[in-house]
Structures are given as structure tokens and as C-alpha cells.
């Protein structure tokens, strides 16, 4: 069985979990099967440019970056146990490139859904909330994408020897958010490992992964809420909002 056929078979398996119900609960018994499928598709080159349903793209991002979006998972836990750890993420070139592509697909689908809904049924207040949510999602998406790119670049710079071919390709594909910064990283890659490690250590302190993890989590939550409120998706997001509100009160 060639890779494309195998990938399609895995995709069909995932469809039974996501498509039929418009959402997926990662606490369910089948979560290990879903995780295995997502992991396989993350490495499948034949799937890199395949359009997947937004539910599956979101699930892949949550899995790939170890996001915990359920507030109940944070209850009764010491703060040290809720801090995101970059070491729990597999900073592998093909996987992160695929994740960035999935993240881009989510944003495109989100924007399409927001444009296509029927505006006539909404009050002025709801339309104002829609615009506010949309602006927030755009900012969060831009920041999250830039953070993932930086941390993947950090991983490349920590390696000895550096994989210059994939490093250059990664910067060309995903570094357009800040060309000057990417050019500086490219120059740094030609220095010895000691200088690279000093640079990475300093910048990891300035831009910790916990910051970008928080931004990415908020972006996914914001996207789910928009799709649920304005486009009739069902991510159980309203239940999460209720839980957060009750905790604050």
C-alpha cells in the first residue's frame, strides 16, 4: 500500500470521529486511536497539501502542541503542573511545517465562515461582538504563528551540525512575518555552536514558549467560539465559557 492510499485510509478513520458529530472529545475511549492517526498524518508528506475538515485541523494543532483547552483539566492542580513545557513538543521539521499549514488552513476556514454567514439574523450588539472576536483572532493567529516559527528556528540552531537545507527551506516557507529577523537567524546559523546556544538561551527567556502556548490556546478557543456562535458548529465551547465565567464569579 503506497503512502497516499495509506494516508487516505487513516483520514477515513478520523472522519468517523470528527465529521459525523462536528466535534471530538479527547477524553473519550477512542482518543488513543485518534492521537495515533493524527501523529501519522503529521508525518505523511502526501497529506501536506490535502484539505481536511476544520475539526481535524484543530484537533491536530491541539495534539501537536499539547494544548489543554478544557478548564476542568486545570482544576485542583498546582500552578507548576499547568505550565506548558516546550519539551513536550516534538520540534521536528516536517511535523511543525505540517502544523503551520494546518494552522493556516484553520485561519482561512475561519475567515471564510465569518464572511459567509447570514448577517440579517444578528442584532447590532452581536455584530459588534463578532467584529471584536474577529479582530482578536487575527492578532492571536499572527502572534501564535510567529512564535511557532521562532521556536522551530531555535531548535534548528541548537543542533550540531545544523540541517542547513531544511533550515533555509523552513525560513523561506514560514518566515515572511519578519524578514529581517529571519535573515539574522540565517546569518547566525553559520556561527559556531557556542554562539548559537547563547543566542537561543537569551531569546528563549525573552520569548518563552509559555507565552506562545497561551496565545495559541486562546486563538483556538476564539476560533471555536466564533464558529459555534456564528456558523452553527458544535465544539462544546459554550459550556467552556460558562465554566470559565462561573469560576471567575
Swiss-Prot record:
The lineage of its organism: Eukaryota, Fungi, Dikarya, Ascomycota, Taphrinomycotina. Telomeric DNA-binding protein that negatively regulates telomerase and telomere length. This is Protection of telomeres protein poz1. Interacts with pot1, rap1 and tpz1. It is found in: Cytoplasm; Nucleus; Chromosome, Telomere. It comes from Schizosaccharomyces pombe (strain 972 / ATCC 24843) (Fission yeast). The keyword Magnesium does not apply. Its main location: cytoplasm. GO terms for cellular component: chromosome, telomeric repeat region; cytosol; nucleus; shelterin complex. One of its GO terms (biological process) is telomere maintenance via telomere lengthening. The keyword Nucleus applies. GO terms for molecular function: DNA binding. Keywords: Chromosome, Cytoplasm, DNA-binding, Nucleus, Telomere. It comes from the Eukaryota.
Amino acid at each position: 500500500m503506497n503512502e497516499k492510499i495509506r494516508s487516505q485510509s487513516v483520514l477515513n478513520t478520523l472522519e468517523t470521529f470528527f465529521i459525523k458529530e462536528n466535534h471530538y472529545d479527547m477524553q473519550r475511549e477512542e482518543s488513543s486511536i485518534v492521537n495515533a492517526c493524527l501523529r501519522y498524518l503529521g508525518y505523511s508528506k502526501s497529506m501536506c497539501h490535502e484539505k481536511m475538515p476544520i475539526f481535524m485541523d484543530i484537533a491536530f494543532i491541539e495534539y501537536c502542541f499539547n494544548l489543554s483547552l478544557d478548564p476542568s483539566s486545570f482544576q485542583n492542580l498546582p500552578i507548576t503542573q499547568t505550565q506548558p513545557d516546550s519539551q513536550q513538543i516534538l520540534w521536528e521539521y516536517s511535523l511543525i511545517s505540517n502544523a503551520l499549514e494546518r494552522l493556516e488552513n484553520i485561519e482561512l476556514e475561519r475567515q471564510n465562515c465569518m464572511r459567509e454567514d447570514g448577517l440579517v439574523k444578528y442584532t447590532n450588539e452581536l455584530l459588534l461582538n463578532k467584529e471584536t472576536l474577529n479582530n482578536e483572532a487575527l492578532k492571536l493567529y499572527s502572534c501564535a504563528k510567529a512564535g511557532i516559527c521562532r521556536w522551530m528556528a531555535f531548535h534548528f540552531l541548537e543542533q550540531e551540525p545544523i540541517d542547513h537545507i531544511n533550515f533555509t527551506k523552513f525560513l523561506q516557507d514560514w518566515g515572511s512575518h519578519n524578514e529581517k529577523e529571519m535573515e539574522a537567524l540565517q546569518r547566525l546559523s553559520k556561527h559556531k555552536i557556542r554562539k548559537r546556544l547563547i543566542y537561543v538561551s537569551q531569546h528563549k527567556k525573552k520569548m518563552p514558549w509559555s507565552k506562545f502556548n497561551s496565545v495559541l490556546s486562546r486563538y483556538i478557543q476564539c476560533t471555536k467560539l466564533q464558529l459555534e456562535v456564528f456558523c452553527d458548529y458544535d465544539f462544546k465551547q459554550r459550556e467552556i465559557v460558562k465554566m470559565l465565567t462561573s469560576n471567575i464569579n
